[in-house]
Structures are given as structure tokens and as C-alpha cells.
């Protein structure tokens, strides 16, 4: 899509644009238009028009932008999602979500999107900073990651193994909450920063604590997994 930003003349209500959306689409020979009136934080109205020809979003191009480099400095787990309607790179922080569902019809690019986001994590985070738990019941989507040193476990391909892996993740989560409470911190970033500041000065009862990497759990075909073992996952 392409977004046009329009600043109404003084005295013109933004409601006018919604009322005349069909006329705008006809004048632009577009199938339809979406009117965002107003664009939050601005004095403009956004008119979003579907492009006749789709633009290919290049991963390398976005990964090379200053936008991604800056996001990587500020975000704990930067994900390259794509571009927004104005053509600017769209980067999201998985650590702030912290859950993400990628949905769509067959052949619409769900796996491409997922691989792009995984690649952006691997590009920026070392195995000491990030671990991955990959669940691939179809056995065909995540084989390329088999040799990655970021894996906390080989790619999980069996349903029973998936249940065990998720149970391990729940146990690990509880253990991490206990460790964070011992340092009076609320999240992984705060825990690691606090631990680093105490290096060489840790009291004896905290000497067993070690830095914690993030753990990202990625499940391909979640619906199929839930159909097979809904009660367990």
C-alpha cells in the first residue's frame, strides 16, 4: 500500500474524508481506500491506497539501514517485521510483546516472515544473549537451524517431545523468577545489569547466580500441535 498524508484546510472537518472515501477511490482508480482521520499525533489525514504492483521487501536492505542499527542498540530482541505503509523499516522488540502470533492463508508468506524475524535475532544476538527453542511438527520448516549454537535443544519434531520441551520451559520460567527475586529485579535485563554491577562483590549466598540469556520459543503450526494435544499444551 501507499499512504498519502493530507493536511486539511483550516475549518475543514476530518469527517469529510471518511464520507467521501468512495469518491476518493474512484478519482484515484483504486479498488478501495482506507482513511485514517486523523493520523495520531499529527494534524494530517492518512489516505491508504493498495498498490497495483506489490513491492518486494528485501531483508538485507532493511538489515543494513540505520533504523535497524539504532533499534538493535535500544531493543533487547529486535525483529525485522518489514516496512510500514510509508515505506519505512518496521522493527519490533520481541521482549516487549512478549508473545507473537503469525497468521494467514496458505502461501501468504507466514514462513518467510518467521524466518526473517529469526534471522534478525541471530544476526544481532550471540548465544550468550539469546537461546532458541524451535518446535517444528511438520519437520520441514526449521531444519536449516539444526546447527545453530543458539539452540537450547535440537529442533523439536515430535509431538511428545514438544510437550516435554514446553514443560521444561515452564519449569525454567519458574526458576528464573526465583533467581530474579533473589536480586530484587523484575526482568532479565535488570537481572543481568544488577549481576554485572555486583561482580567481585557478590555475597556468598548469591555466588551461584549466573547471567541469563533470553529464551525465544518458536512453534511452527501451533494450531496443528494444539489439535493433537490440546490438554497438554
Language model: regions and residue ranges:
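P-loop NTPase motor-domain active sites and their immediate coupling elements
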Residues: 1, 11, 21, 42-91, ...
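P-loop NTPase switch/communication element
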Residues: 95, 122-160, 164-165
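Conserved beta-strand position immediately N-terminal to the Walker
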Residues: 100
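Alpha-helical transmembrane segments of multipass membrane proteins
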Residues: 120-121, 225
Amino acid at each position: 500500500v501507499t499512504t498519502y498524508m493530507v493536511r486539511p484546510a483550516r475549518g475543514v472537518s476530518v469527517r469529510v474524508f471518511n464520507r467521501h472515501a468512495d469518491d476518493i477511490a474512484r478519482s484515484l482508480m483504486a479498488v478501495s481506500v482506507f482513511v485514517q482521520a486523523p493520523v495520531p499525533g499529527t494534524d494530517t489525514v492518512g489516505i491508504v491506497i493498495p498498490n497495483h504492483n506489490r513491492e518486494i521487501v528485501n531483508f538485507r536492505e532493511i538489515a543494513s539501514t540505520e533504523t535497524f542499527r539504532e533499534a538493535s542498540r535500544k531493543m533487547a530482541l529486535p525483529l525485522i517485521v518489514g516496512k510500514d505503509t510509508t515505506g519505512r523499516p518496521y522493527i519490533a522488540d520481541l521482549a516487549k510483546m512478549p508473545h507473537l502470533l503469525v497468521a494467514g492463508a496458505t502461501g501468504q508468506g507466514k514462513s518467510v516472515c518467521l524466518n526473517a524475524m529469526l534471522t534478525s535475532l541471530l544476526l544481532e544476538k550471540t548465544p550468550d544473549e539469546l537461546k532458541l527453542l524451535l518446535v517444528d511438527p511438520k519437520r520441514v520448516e526449521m531444519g536449516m537451524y539444526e546447527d545453530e549454537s543458539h539452540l537450547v535443544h535440537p529442533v523439536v519434531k515430535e509431538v511428545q517431545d514438544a510437550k516435554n520441551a514446553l514443560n521444561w520451559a515452564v519449569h525454567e520460567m519458574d526458576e528464573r523468577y526465583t533467581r530474579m527475586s533473589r536480586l530484587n529485579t523484575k526482568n532479565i535485563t535488570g537481572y543481568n545489569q544488577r549481576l554485572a554491577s555486583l561482580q567481585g562483590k557478590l555475597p556468598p549466598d548469591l555466588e551461584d547466580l549466573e547471567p541469563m540469556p533470553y529464551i525465544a520459543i518458536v512453534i511452527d503450526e501451533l494450531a496443528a500441535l494444539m489439535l493433537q494435544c490440546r490438554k497438554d499444551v
